[in-house]
Regions:
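Non-catalytic, soluble scaffold/interaction modules
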Residues: 1-175, 183
Length: 183
């Protein structure tokens, strides 16, 4: 049995089978769709997930996906993407990393935190370009292990099956948010 030590975000002990969620871009995998097609599909997907979240009273996550759509429609990002319809996945993602670095350099904590949202949108756009399905099927009583999680990551998961979350980087869940997800 493996034992893990860290900072607790929420009181209690969770027992269950582990699921390691990997959210890394494989830049060697070719794009199937252009970034324009992938962006349209991603907006449709996020819009559908927003309606689903609202019906399940997961309004905070729905609001974040609303913001993700605004990022995809941001005039500066769209202008950079429209410079070349044949951008590679690296070139598309670099637009999001350079935009995120601008936000990370800002003094305001709110804007610094938006850098993670921008990177998340960039990753999901690349996944869409590569036609990588991000649907995750979890077993009952799962302990979810990840480097980090964003609302776009958890949007396709049945969180009622999650007993606990172990994160390397606590970007998404504070104690209250973790309690909401895990119950």
């Amino acid at each position: 049995m493996t034992s893990v030590k860290g900072l607790g975000a929420s009181l209690g002990v969770a027992i269950g089978s582990s699921f390691v969620y990997k959210n890394e871009i494989d830049f060697d995998k070719e794009a199937i769709l252009t970034h324009v097609e992938a962006s349209k599909q991603l907006i449709e997907k996020f819009s559908s997930q927003i309606l689903d979240f609202r019906s399940k009273e997961r309004n905070d996550e729905a609001d974040i996906l609303d913001a993700y759509i605004l990022i995809l429609q941001d005039p500066e990002i769209v202008a950079q993407l429209n410079q070349n319809l044949d951008f590679s996945v690296e070139e598309v993602y670099s637009i999001f990393t350079s935009t995120a670095s601008v936000f990370e350099s800002m003094e305001d904590v709110y804007f610094k935190q938006r850098a993670e949202d921008i990177l998340s949108v960039g990753k999901h756009l690349v996944f869409n370009m590569q036609n990588i399905e991000r649907e995750i099927t979890l077993n009952e009583n799962t302990i979810l292990i990840a480097e980090d999680l964003t609302p776009a990551d958890t949007s396709s998961m049945d969180l009622s099956k999650v007993n606990g979350i172990v994160l390397k980087d606590c970007l998404l869940y504070t104690s209250d948010a973790a309690d909401d997800v895990v119950g």
